[in-house]
């Protein structure tokens, strides 16, 4: 009865008959058309605003995680980053919310599980997601007013965009008074442009789409942007006539339309910037070579990045675009694909280039095939080799099994119920929508699949696409060569540009002293403006309330079974005919030398193949029969003792219910059957290592603060130390060291250890499993699991108990890396998950982030990001900064934050906001396969979670102060803090710091 009622409710949300008919008016909008898409369980409605012409797409679906986005077409007129700086400054105060930074001030006043803003190459959009109806209205009000009626103050432009000012205006020494370029976006883009992968993609984009300038901004050009240009660009582009609004979920469309119409009615219709830029015309071969940064952790001889690109057809042809994406998968995806085998396996490069594959986000599709880690002598050979592989693939044709495998992956992606389906939908539709592709065509999955299968039935369809687009020389070959002086050249250029600006200011002011006074005065005025953030009245901002948060949450129902010695956690839930499997094999006394190679082991078993099946055959089987299987390293502290840690190997898999036995068979084949003795095993493992090492400096930079935090934490707890060995900077050093071994090295010592891991991965240790599936599949899955475990000859492990390891004692560690900005972390030990003191620490981290650190580290210090965190399970409290130009200042702020929190007179509102922030994460929607996983992975029971929930709701101001005193102030005084920073080594990194060079062992 209840099930039928739920089905009825689901149907009601998407029932076409409840919506207006095309042509009908609705709160200032006219419904243009509607479409029910049963395969996605949704109904799409396209509306247009009568007065302004604003486009509106609503997707009705029985999903409580509702999404909103407003976006604008923002073709950048130059490389000054005007769309990017505007994206930042619109969020610094608006007519209805005239306070500093309402976007960040809203973060602790909302239960949203996602809030952000993004600048794409030719459009800018502002999305959020929440399950709370009042919250949705609140955020929509702030987003609409921020984008359509921003204050755009000059001080916001200088803070977020760029300015010249003293390096540290609060310090008295001469070095701190040195004039430098500053600004949040300026520093962000300096960080981005020192990432060789990002730089390659941006410069490639410059040449394939010469009419689309760099929307993010080139630091060399950002300093040309004026405040007046920013205002003009906003007036012309952030207008309803140039807007696309998107809503998704189960909340009533009528409520959304009323609210949006109220905001749009103030505008008259104008001619929006609807220009859709075409790529370059290629009537023959074109070659471009530019210089980029050298990666000091990779073989100096393999530093080139190069690619060959073709222009495809119009992406409004959704069927052809889908087919080209599938063709790209068949040609490039997986170790058995022809291009992987012919290029990377053949040793021409280490990995795919950042632009590789089919890109359908613009008006015309772009098909690129390229490599990183290429030797200079191989660069001119790439195009001919690619053409040869494409001709061979075209003549051979495509195996139906491989095509069916790709279509099967598509089927599973539709069935898999994710918590962020609406946001994924927005990301899939939005870029094409802004470039003229009808979103209704993009939504018509079944029509596209049926059309594809009809074309395939005619014969030679994919081969015909290769003929049509790829077997010609209308190509762009784009190469980035390494320059040993690239970083120095950037610094020199910046100094010259700064000097020119200062000279111009001196000329205008009449003297050097007057010019300096002008810059110092501007900086002081900005500081005064920034300091208002601590005292201004936020009463105008809407908020949800702690009283609206339920004191208890419906528990996830799981049950335990011990079937013939196999421990199973069952979670029965509606899964759309899918079964999700996890298993953990806990390993006691795992030696360090084996642990650090577990990531290489898990990569190797997805690469080498078995004695009976090569990797291509295994990949085909995985795609055809599962939604993916994986093997990885697992470690967790105990919820009752954060100093204790258990570790092991984790196995995951997903499949349609009837394919579960095959999924188990595949896992067994991969783990136990991988052939480490094959003649090419050493070569394949070397290629895996080289692919991991290639671009590692850029990979670190993309999450540099996480690497810094991980390094700091590794000196505090066993669990954090284990993580550092497997996924931190220690792992990076191991991989780069192994990758740099000479080609003559057969890696016998490494392979011997990988075989030891293979012998204990699945059959040694203590195995426990978890299955999430529909009730109707429990019996069959139980039998399949019994069969799987029964086939494993499980032996007791005989690993020697290692002597207890002392954690590193270095209180300050510095990693010299070639970045223009810094990444840092400071960490302290706290208490276990079940301790009552954990809740005040979590609240404290939110208070410090929103009330202090964001203001000090980002707004005043110029870093792209900074904050505090408390990880209850890990028993750690810490601070971080990201893309930070001012690390000394940041470290001082971190060290003094505890005392600041003790001295601060917290208000009831402060506490309320911090609790709301915590519950964004606590109550964020979960995908069905994540339910019950805290218990399985780490032993956190529903009772523990409920207790923690009540503790969060009941935290007092005194408890927060006590936690700050005990764990931060006293902890630092006792020397319990650990610090790590990454970046360029300068004079301030003195003898107190332990310097950890990241050099490759054995490299010249």
UniProtKB/Swiss-Prot annotation:
Its main location: mitochondrion. It is found in: Mitochondrion intermembrane space; Mitochondrion matrix. Gene3D superfamilies: Metalloenzyme, LuxS/M16 peptidase-like (3.30.830.10). One of its GO terms (biological process) is protein processing. One of its GO terms (molecular function) is metalloendopeptidase activity. The active site is at residues 87, 160. Binds 1 zinc ion per subunit. Disulfide bonds: none annotated. Its cofactor is Zn(2+). Zn(2+) binds at residues 84, 88, 188. One of its GO terms (cellular component) is mitochondrial matrix. It comes from the Eukaryota. InterPro entries: Metalloenz_LuxS/M16, Pept_M16_N, Peptidase_M16_C, Peptidase_M16C_assoc, PreP_C. Its EC number is 3.4.24.-. Belongs to the peptidase M16 family. PreP subfamily. Monomer and homodimer; homodimerization is induced by binding of the substrate. Degrades mitochondrial transit peptides after their cleavage in the intermembrane space or in the matrix, and presequence peptides; clearance of these peptides is required to keep the presequence processing machinery running. Preferentially cleaves the N-terminal side of paired basic amino acid residues. Also degrades other unstructured peptides. May function as an ATP-dependent peptidase as opposed to a metalloendopeptidase. PANTHER family: PRESEQUENCE PROTEASE, PRESEQUENCE PROTEASE, MITOCHONDRIAL. This is Presequence protease, mitochondrial. It comes from Gibberella zeae (strain ATCC MYA-4620 / CBS 123657 / FGSC 9075 / NRRL 31084 / PH-1). The gene is CYM1.
């Amino acid at each position: 009865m209840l099930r039928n009622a739920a089905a009825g409710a689901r149907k009601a949300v998407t029932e076409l008959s409840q919506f207006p008919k095309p042509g009908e008016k609705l709160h200032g909008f006219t419904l243009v058309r509607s479409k029910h898409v049963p395969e996605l369980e949704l109904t799409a409605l396209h509306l247009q605003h009568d007065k302004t012409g604003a486009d509106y797409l609503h997707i009705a679906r029985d999903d409580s995680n509702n999404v909103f986005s407003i976006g604008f077409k923002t073709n950048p007129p130059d490389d000054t980053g005007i769309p990017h700086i505007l994206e930042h400054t619109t969020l610094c105060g608006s007519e209805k919310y005239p306070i500093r930074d309402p976007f960040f001030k809203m973060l602790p006043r909302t239960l949203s599980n996602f809030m952000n803003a993004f600048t794409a190459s030719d459009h800018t959009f502002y999305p959020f997601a929440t399950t709370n109806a009042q919250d949705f209205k609140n955020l929509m009000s702030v987003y609409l007013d921020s984008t359509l009626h921003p204050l755009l103050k000059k001080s916001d432009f200088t803070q977020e965009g760029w300015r010249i000012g003293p390096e540290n205006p609060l310090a008295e020494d001469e070095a701190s008074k040195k004039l430098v370029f500053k600004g949040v976006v300026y520093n962000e883009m300096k960080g981005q442009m020192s990432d060789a992968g990002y730089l390659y993609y941006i410069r490639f984009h410059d040449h394939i789409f010469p009419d689309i300038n760099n929307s993010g901004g080139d630091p060399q050009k950002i300093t040309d942007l004026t405040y007046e240009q920013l205002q003009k660009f906003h007036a012309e582009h952030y207008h309803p006539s140039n807007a696309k609004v998107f809503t998704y979920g189960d909340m009533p469309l009528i409520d959304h339309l009323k609210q949006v119409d109220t905001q749009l009615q103030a505008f008259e219709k104008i001619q929006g910037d609807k220009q859709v830029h075409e790529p370059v015309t290629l009537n023959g071969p074109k070659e471009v070579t530019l210089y980029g940064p050298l990666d000091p952790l990779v073989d100096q001889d393999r530093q080139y990045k190069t690619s060959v690109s073709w222009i495809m057809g119009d992406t409004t042809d959704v069927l052809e675009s889908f087919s080209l994406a599938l063709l790209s998968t068949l040609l490039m995806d997986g170790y058995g694909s022809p291009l992987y085998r012919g290029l990377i396996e053949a040793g021409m490069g280490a990995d795919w280039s950042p632009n590789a594959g089919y890109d359908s986000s613009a008006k015309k599709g772009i098909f690129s095939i390229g490599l990183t880690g290429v030797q200079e002598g191989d660069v001119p050979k790439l195009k001919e080799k690619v053409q040869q592989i494409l001709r061979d693939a075209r003549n051979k044709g495509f195996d139906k099994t491989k095509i069916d495998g790709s279509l099967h992956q598509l089927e599973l992606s539709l069935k898999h119920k994710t918590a962020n389906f609406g946001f994924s939908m927005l990301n899939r539709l939005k870029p094409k929508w802004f470039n003229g592709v009808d979103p209704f065509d993009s939504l018509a999955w079944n029509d596209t699949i049926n059309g594809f299968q009809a074309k395939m039935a005619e014969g030679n369809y994919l081969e015909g696409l290769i003929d049509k687009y790829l077997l010609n020389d209308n190509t762009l070959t784009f190469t980035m060569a390494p320059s040993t002086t690239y970083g120095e050249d950037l610094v020199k250029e910046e100094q010259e540009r700064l000097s020119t600006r200062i000279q111009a200011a001196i000329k205008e002011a009449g003297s050097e002293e007057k010019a300096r006074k002008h810059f110092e005065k501007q900086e002081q005025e900005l500081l005064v403006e920034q300091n208002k953030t601590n005292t201004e009245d936020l009463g105008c901002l809407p908020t949800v309330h702690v009283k609206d948060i339920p004191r208890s949450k419906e528990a996830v129902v799981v049950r335990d079974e011990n079937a013939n010695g196999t421990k199973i956690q069952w979670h029965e839930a509606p899964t759309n005919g899918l079964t999700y499997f996890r298993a953990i094999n806990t390993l006691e006394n795992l030696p360090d030398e084996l642990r650090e190679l577990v990531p290489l082991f898990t990569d190797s078993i997805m690469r080498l193949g078995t004695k009976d099946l090569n990797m291509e055959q295994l990949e085909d089987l995985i795609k055809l029969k599962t939604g993916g299987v994986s093997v990885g390293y697992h470690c967790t502290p105990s919820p009752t003792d954060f100093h204790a840690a258990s570790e092991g190997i984790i196995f995951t898999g997903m499949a349609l219910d009837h394919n579960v036995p095959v999924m188990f068979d595949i896992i067994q084949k991969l783990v136990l059957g991988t052939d480490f003795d094959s003649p090419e095993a050493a070569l394949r493992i070397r290629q895996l290592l080289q692919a991991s090492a290639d671009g590692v400096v850029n990979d670190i930079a993309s999450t540099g603060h996480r690497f810094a935090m991980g390094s700091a934490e590794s000196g505090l707890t066993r669990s954090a130390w284990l993580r550092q060995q497997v996924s931190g900077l220690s792992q990076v050093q191991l991989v780069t060291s192994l990758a740099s071994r000479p080609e003559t090295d057969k890696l016998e010592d490494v392979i011997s250890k990988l075989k030891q891991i293979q012998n204990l991965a699945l059959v040694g240790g203590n195995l426990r499993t978890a299955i999430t599936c529909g009730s109707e599949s429990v019996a069959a899955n139980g039998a399949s699991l019994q069969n799987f475990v029964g086939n494993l000859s499980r032996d007791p492990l005989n690993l020697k108990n290692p002597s207890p390891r002392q954690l590193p004692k270095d209180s300050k560690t510095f990693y010299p890396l070639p970045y223009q900005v810094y990444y840092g972390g400071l960490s302290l030990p706290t208490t276990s998950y079940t301790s009552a003191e954990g809740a005040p620490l979590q609240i404290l981290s939110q208070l410090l982030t929103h009330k202090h650190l964001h203001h000090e580290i980002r707004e005043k210090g110029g870093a792209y990001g900074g904050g505090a965190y408390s990880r209850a399970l890990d028993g750690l409290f810490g601070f971080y900064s990201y893309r930070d130009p001012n690390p000394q200042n940041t470290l001082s702020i971190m060290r003094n934050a505890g005392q600041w929190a003790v001295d601060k007179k917290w208000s009831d509102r402060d506490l309320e906001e911090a609790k709301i922030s915590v519950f964004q994460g606590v109550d964020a929607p979960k995908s069905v396969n994540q339910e019950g996983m805290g218990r399985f992975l780490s032993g956190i029971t529903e009772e523990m979670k409920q207790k923690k929930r009540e503790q969060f709701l009941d935290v007092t101001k005194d408890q927060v102060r006590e936690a700050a005193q005990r764990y931060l102030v006293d902890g630092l005084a006792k020397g319990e803090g650990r610090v790590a920073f990454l970046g360029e080594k300068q004079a301030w990194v003195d003898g107190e710091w332990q310097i950890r060079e990241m050099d490759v062992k054995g490299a010249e």
